[in-house]
C-alpha cells in the first residue's frame, strides 16, 4: 500500500471495517464457510477479487473456526497480460496460490464477431477450468468476488431480457454438481469496494485485454441502478432487502405457490388482497451501515452460523 494521509488512513480503516462486517454477516447468513474448509479464492486481478482475498485473509486470522485459503488465477494467454504482477503480489502476502495457464484467448478469438461480446463463452470456458482446478486442489468451496450490485444487476437482466425473476445466489452448487460456490461480498456495495481498492493500491490488471466489447445490456442496467442510487437514496438498499423477503403467494408463479388449491377455507394468506401499503413500509436508510445488514456486534467474528 502506498503512503496514505491521516484522513485517507481513517477512511481506509472505516471502509475495511464496513466491508469486513458485511462479508462476515453474509458468510454467517448463508453458512458459506465451515470448519475445515479449503477455500479456492478466484483472483482475476480486478478490484473485487483483490478485496475479497484481503478480507478473507483478515477474517481467517480472527475466526473461531479453522479454514484454509488458496488463491487461484487463470492466465488465459491474453496478449499483454502482465504475468508477473499476481505472483509478486501474492508472495508478499505469504498466501498459498496457483496460476493456471490455459489458452482460452485463442478459442474465444476464433468466435469473436467485431462489435460483439464473447464474455459468455469466455465465462463458460473459465468456469470449467476453475472447477477442474478446484478438484485438483482438494478445495471444498470456490469463492467468487461478485458483490451486491452484481446480484441486483443480474436480477434486472433476467427480468428485462430473460423473463425470469432470478438473481445471482450468494451460495450455490456448481454447474457440474461437484462444488459449492460462494460469494462472500454479496452484502457489499461496489462503490465501497472501488474506494477501498483505490486506497489499498492493489496492482489492478485491466479486464479489457481480450478486445471484446462490454456487455451493453449489463452496462445499461448498471447505469440505471447508479442513476436510481443518486436520485432516490435508499432504493438500492430496499431492492436488495426485497430479494431477501420474497412472498410467493403474491407473485404469479403457480409452480412456486399452489394457487389452485386455494378456497374459502384457506384463510387469509400473507395479508390477503393488500398488495402494497406505503404506511407499513419501513423507512430505508441511505447509508449501507444501517441497511440490509443490521449488524449484531456479538456476531462480528462469527463467520459461520453455529446454530
Curated annotation (Swiss-Prot):
Pathway: tRNA modification. A motif (PP-loop motif) lies at residues 44-49. Pfam families: ATP_bind_3. Its cofactor is Mg(2+); [4Fe-4S] cluster. One of its GO terms (cellular component) is cytoplasm. NCBIfam families: PRK10696.1. Homodimer. Catalyzes the ATP-dependent 2-thiolation of cytidine in position 32 of tRNA, to form 2-thiocytidine (s(2)C32). The sulfur atoms are provided by the cysteine/cysteine desulfurase (IscS) system. This is tRNA-cytidine(32) 2-sulfurtransferase.
Amino acid at each position: 500500500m502506498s503512503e496514505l494521509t491521516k484522513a485517507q488512513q481513517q477512511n481506509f480503516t472505516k471502509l475495511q471495517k464496513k466491508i469486513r462486517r458485511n462479508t462476515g454477516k453474509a458468510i454467517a447468513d448463508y453458512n458459506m464457510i465451515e470448519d475445515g474448509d479449503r477455500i479456492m479464492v478466484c483472483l482475476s486481478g480486478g478490484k473485487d477479487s483483490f478485496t475479497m482475498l484481503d478480507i478473507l485473509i483478515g477474517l481467517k486470522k480472527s475466526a473461531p473456526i479453522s479454514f484454509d485459503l488458496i488463491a487461484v488465477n487463470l492466465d488465459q494467454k491474453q496478449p499483454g497480460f502482465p504475468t508477473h504482477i499476481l505472483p509478486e503480489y501474492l508472495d508478499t502476502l505469504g498466501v498459498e496460490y496457483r496460476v493456471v495457464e490455459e489458452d482460452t484467448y485463442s478459442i474465444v478469438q476464433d468466435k469473436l464477431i467485431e462489435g460483439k461480446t464473447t464474455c459468455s463463452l469466455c465465462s463458460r470456458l473459465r468456469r470449467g477450468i476453475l472447477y477442474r482446478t478446484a478438484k485438483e486442489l482438494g478445495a471444498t468451496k470456490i469463492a467468487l468476488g461478485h458483490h451486491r450490485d452484481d446480484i441486483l444487476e443480474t436480477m434486472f437482466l433476467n427480468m428485462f431480457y430473460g423473463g425470469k425473476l432470478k438473481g445471482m445466489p450468494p451460495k450455490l452448487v456448481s454447474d457440474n454438481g461437484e462444488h459449492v460456490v460462494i460469494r462472500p461480498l454479496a452484502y457489499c456495495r461496489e462503490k465501497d469496494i472501488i474506494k477501498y481498492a483505490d486506497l489499498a493500491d492493489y496492482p489492478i490488471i485491466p479486464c479489457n485485454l481480450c478486445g471484446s466489447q462490454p456487455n451493453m445490456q449489463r452496462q445499461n442496467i448498471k447505469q440505471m441502478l447508479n442513476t436510481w442510487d443518486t436520485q432516490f437514496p435508499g432504493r438500492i438498499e430496499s431492492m436488495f432487502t426485497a430479494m431477501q423477503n420474497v412472498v410467493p403467494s403474491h407473485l404469479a408463479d403457480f409452480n412456486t405457490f399452489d394457487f389452485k388449491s386455494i378456497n374459502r377455507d384457506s384463510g387469509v394468506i400473507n395479508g390477503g388482497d393488500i398488495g402494497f401499503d406505503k404506511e407499513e413500509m419501513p423507512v430505508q436508510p441511505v447509508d449501507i451501515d444501517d441497511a440490509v445488514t443490521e449488524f449484531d456486534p456479538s456476531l462480528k467474528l462469527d463467520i459461520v452460523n453455529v446454530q
